Every structure is written in C-alpha cells, then in structure tokens.
Amino acid sequence: MPLVKSLSKNSIYEIFSRFSKINPEPKGELEYTSAYTLLVAVVLSAQSTDIGVNKATRKLFELASTPEKMLLLGENRIIENIRTIGLYKNKAKNIVSLSQKLIDNFNSKVPKTHRELQSLAGVGRKTANVVLSMAFGVPTIAVDTHVYRVSNRTGIAIGKNVDEVEEQLIKRIPKKFFFHAHHWLILHGRYTCKARSPLCNECIISELCPSKLLN
C-alpha cells in the first residue's frame, strides 16, 4: 500500500457527499431477521464472504433463529449447516457458547454495549461495532479489510492497524455522514477499490484520491 498524505477536511467531506448522492441509504449485505441472527451472521462472516454466509444461514435460521432454538439444534447440526464456511467447527462452538451466555446472562437478548458484546465467544471489537450499528442504530465504525484498505489508500484515515484507522475515522468523518460511513467504505472497497486491480477509471472519487495520482 503506497504511502499517502492525509486528505483535507474538505476533500473528505466531498468524498462522503458523493457516496451519499449515489447511495443515500446503504445497507449491509448480510441477511438477518433480528439482532440475534445478525450477531450469528457477523460471527460467521470472519474470513468468509457475505455471499457464502448468506447461503449457509438461510437454512440455519429456518431451523434456529433464537438462542434457545440454536442450543436445541446443537453443535453437530450447526456444523452440518455451516460446513461451507471457513473455520466452521470453531464458529459452531462459538455460536453454541454465545447462545448459552445470552440465555444465562442477558435474558436471551443481544446486549447493547461494547463490553458486554465482546464478552461473547467469537465477538471482537469489529463484530461488536457491526452489531451496534446495524441492530441498534449506534453510530460506530467497524474496520474490516475493505474499510482499512480504502481508508489508507484514499488518505481518509491512515493507520498501521485497524485500531489506528478506527480512531482516525471517528475523528475525521463529518458527523453528517458518520452513521452510513461504514457501509459506504465497505461497498467501495468490495466493488471499486479492490485489493487487486482497483477500478480507478470507474471510481467516483478518483480525482480526490492520492493513490490514484501516484499511479
């Protein structure tokens, strides 16, 4: 990833303004019907594609869409339904564990704080941020591989790790655009600013991007 300078506030505002104009209400691509099914889907999505996760969870969630039903389904049957997803054995254990803890500690409800969410098996800061944002409308920034890449390439937020990038994004994204920023950055990274062969000629922010100017 080339070394670039941080963008100015005006340039950052313009970038998110353009994202907003072409996609005013961006949505995540994981399929879910409740805070619980969202939590499970996000846990399953680690090192997996949303398409692959959705294919597995359509059947899984028909069988079990609550912590109680997931425990009744059991680890082996969970494995049967998510076998196409990477790290499926470990993820099945995490789903059983987090479901049990939700029942025991949270009255079967998905908690609404970082600390409580991260006490669940398989839930780190990124997963907690996604759940807080998508399930409860809390303005957060979850830095996945797409957000990290786009932030550094464009100079929106430069950091050596996801924590540094998250910290910079929180400081630098205009409040007007903060709630949807996570999804805009993910979608831009997934479909335009790809890891290999980014589509700079099709990019709506290319003339603002220092990485494009370096090429």
Predicted regions: what is each one?
Residues 2-215:
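Catalytic cores of DNA base-excision repair glycosylases
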